[in-house]
Amino acid sequence: MQAQTQVKGLKELGLEPSEIFHNLSYDEIYEHEKKNGETVVSSNGTMMVDTGIFTGRSPKDKYFVDEPSSNGNIWWSHINFKVSEAIFDELYKKCVNYLSHKKLYVFDGYAGANPETRVSLRVVSEKAWQHHFCTNMFLRPTKEELVGLDPEFTIINACGIKNENFKQHGMNSEVFVIFHLAKKICIIGGTEYGGEMKKGIFSVMNYKLPLQGILSMHCSANVGQDGDTALFFGLSGTGKTTLSTDPNRKLIGDDEHGWDDNGIFNIEGGCYAKVINLDPKTEPDIYEAIRKDALLENVVYDPQTKIVDYSSAAKTENTRVSYPIFHINNIQVPSKGGHPKTIIFLTYDAFGVLPPVSKLSIEQAMYHFLSGYTAKVAGTERGIKEPTATFSACFGAAFMTLHPTKYAKLLGEKMKKHNVRAYLMNTGLVGGSYGVGKRMNLPSTRKIIDEILNGNIEKSEFVTHPVFQVAYPKTISGVDSAILDPREAWTDKAAYDQTAKKLGEMFIKNFKQYAEGSKDFDFTAFGPKI
């Protein structure tokens, strides 16, 4: 593709590049990456990139401009930090000056697979591999759409500059990811990491959509042969991607979705999967998606053969691959589904006290959605490993731009309107806490999900848990009944009672932030009772 000297709208942003490459094809991107020396080709033709110092997002460097049109809506917190208009203007000018007279890549596309509610977007970058990342991850326009595309939101990625004055500005570091919601612009500096662009647009959608009555969600979604849509929520390591990939169901998307008056839609046009310890036997879909046009990040490979070692975390545990969604065979086209019939919250309970599966009322679903619980195992200074609870509102607090209760309220309204069933699944430990309990085996978990999705679970007799107040089934066809009652699965019943109480108290303590001063969200009655 020949370089252009101007693309509509760039001059208005203050950008005057020497050359512009606009929505390149994959073959053209490949040539640019090679020519620029940005990537290495793996043994099977997949491009590999080293993202530099940053191999993950920089959550403490994410800011929103404190301006009148949005400051009353934003959830100002340890996740969304304030920055002044003056600081934004100073750094914006720095970004524009840095990028002007350079060769730039411009990606124009969309976020949101529903044409009625999608957001047009633009990403300007100096690196061909970042253009590649955007081409993989966002919705790619047709040639006809590209001609008339007027981007509503723009990301200017000046990853090659740093904010040396961050201390005077009262900011966290030289890195910055700043959103100006009134001007509909995001500027990025100091980090090359691709996920900043992906989650940047998600943060914008998490602001914009709920204000229009559309629920934005950090979840995966699939659809059955009868057109029944299911949503899977869960923090990292709970099995969200693995469990929503099902040979009998078509994938709508693996990470970001919206729920509007027509149903569910994918916000993205691609997948961004973790590849540490990737095994072709357990995750064949992801393994087979890693081919030409995919982009591997920070993986270790043999310098001679260029064969990737997925078991190595020498650079980072957060090794990733981005690829367009059509690299997965069993997908829903377009990436949309009807209103969900089922919602499944996944948690890895390292305390081993939650039932493998429980049924939730709408109020309980809102409670657990706001709690966003999972538990990890962290080493203490004595070398003893014990679980630590993690609560992340809406199963994705890091990306929630509005107050979490806004999303929970919308969830409850939509569940009620469309008669949606919700379940809480423990994909973690049963029969004991870490060191004693065993992880729920994948075949049992998959069988439970099958019984949820085909409705057979509702034929079971349910028992209410004395602490967590959730209803769990006594029997499920094809699943060992001994594990369904979490207390019975423990040898030491007193230890179970003590641990269940301890986790229940953690839920209650965490939920105080939503109950206090909120008439709408005093859902403490629907959480644990000690």
From Swiss-Prot:
One of its GO terms (cellular component) is cytosol. The keyword Nucleotide-binding applies. InterPro entries: PEP_carboxykinase_ATP, PEP_carboxykinase_C, PEP_carboxykinase_N, PEPCK_ATP_CS. Gene3D superfamilies: 3.90.228.20, Phosphoenolpyruvate Carboxykinase, domain 1, Phosphoenolpyruvate Carboxykinase, domain 2. Pfam families: PEPCK_ATP. GO terms for biological process: gluconeogenesis. Its EC number is 4.1.1.49. Signal peptide: none annotated. Transmembrane segments: none annotated. It is an enzyme of class 4 (lyase). Substrate binds at R57, Y193, K199, R320. Pathway: Carbohydrate biosynthesis; gluconeogenesis. Binds 1 Mn(2+) ion per subunit. PANTHER family: PHOSPHOENOLPYRUVATE CARBOXYKINASE (ATP), PHOSPHOENOLPYRUVATE CARBOXYKINASE ATP. HAMAP family: PEPCK_ATP. Involved in the gluconeogenesis. Catalyzes the conversion of oxaloacetate (OAA) to phosphoenolpyruvate (PEP) through direct phosphoryl transfer between the nucleoside triphosphate and OAA. This is Phosphoenolpyruvate carboxykinase (ATP). It comes from Leptospira interrogans serogroup Icterohaemorrhagiae serovar Lai (strain 56601). The gene is pckA.
